[in-house]
Amino acid sequence: MNFTNDEIMNEIKENMNKKTYTPDFIPDGYKVKPNSYGAALYQIIPSRKDGEPDKERFITTTIPEINTRYENIENGEVSYNMHFFDNRTPVNLNVTAEEITDSKQLLKLVNRKLDVTSNTSSKLIDYINQSKRYSPPINIKVATRLGHVKDYFIYPYKDQMENSNVKLHNNDRGFQKLINSFKSKGTLSDYSEKVFVKIKDLPMVMVMLYASLGSVLLYEFDIMPFIVELAGSTSTGKTFTLNLVASVWGTTDLTTTWSSTRNSIEAMASFLNSFPMFKDDTRNISPNFIANAVYNYSSGESKSRSNKNLTIDEKKEWKNIMLSTGEASITNMAEDKAGVSARVVTLEEQPYPDNYDFISLDHEFRENYGTLGIEFFKQYQSKKDKYKDCLLYTSPSPRD
């Protein structure tokens, strides 16, 4: 009998909500006894003498159950969901395969409420893997990045992924804030009538909005990452515009500052993958940093790095658009102006007319967001072959 991912996830949630402190399956050779914390797990040591009772060796008060196996469609790596009760409170941990097969790695989970010591870790490892073999966890295919992954397009929106055979799986708290910022409110009609109508005649704003939407098409047309920036000495409207064009995908929390490390920019670009990145205010960034960041980002791949196993980490790739703001243009800030300018589209004209009504527009895009981007990409997907043929037909030949 086949089950959908939704049916599987609902069953997992129902099991997690049950008021029981004992897993459904306990392997032979183990025993669970109730205590003031809920329950405790013991290993049964058979007696060697007739008539002598078996011994019970304590293992843990947080009896783990491995109920879900996550299979990464991109690299084949697996991880697991570990469920247990800590002082009668349910706990769910995303754990790596290494953490539940190596006693030293398992010990690190003590900081995440697992009751384990150096004396019990190896026994708990044995128990976990016996349980997993005799009661295999449900397998779910997952992606750990957004956008184009293998033959799938991974949305950050829960309702868009409900019927997908692949689920988004994230273990990073920093990225979780980004995921939570991808959400929608209102309707496409509301966005059109209350937001789009107010900006459709503003060229600089519309270029930024088109870049925000167009980011998800770079993979489709095999275009390398690039940056679109709104620059100018005036303080009017740059950050406002960045928040505005982020609203096609979600809330203003999608906007982050340039005050971050190159590694964090690279990690965010890799995670967003196809979706745009919004970076505000280059003012406090050094010319050397901005040049290196532009080159690293526009290369579309992470740097090669060695790991603790003395091997090379797998490179991550991305194809998206970064939208940026700053008083000085990135091109003028960088020492290598020619090299950087080939990777940056700079908009320096005033984005809004004098006495523009920012207050009402700010209210509208904070109340209506996250609808245009979804519908834009759905429309493209519905007729992608026609759109690609049209682009090939209208593109100039190499001789032109």
List the model feature ranges, each with a label.
Residues F3-K198:
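Conserved glycine-centered beta->alpha loop in an early N-terminal alpha/beta scaffold
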Residues N292-S304:
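Conserved catalytic/switch belt of AAA+ P-loop NTPases
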Residues E301-K316, I330-D336:
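Conserved Walker
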Residues M333-D385:
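Conserved P-loop NTPase catalytic core
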Residues Y393-D400:
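Conserved small/polar residues in nucleotide/adenosyl-binding loops
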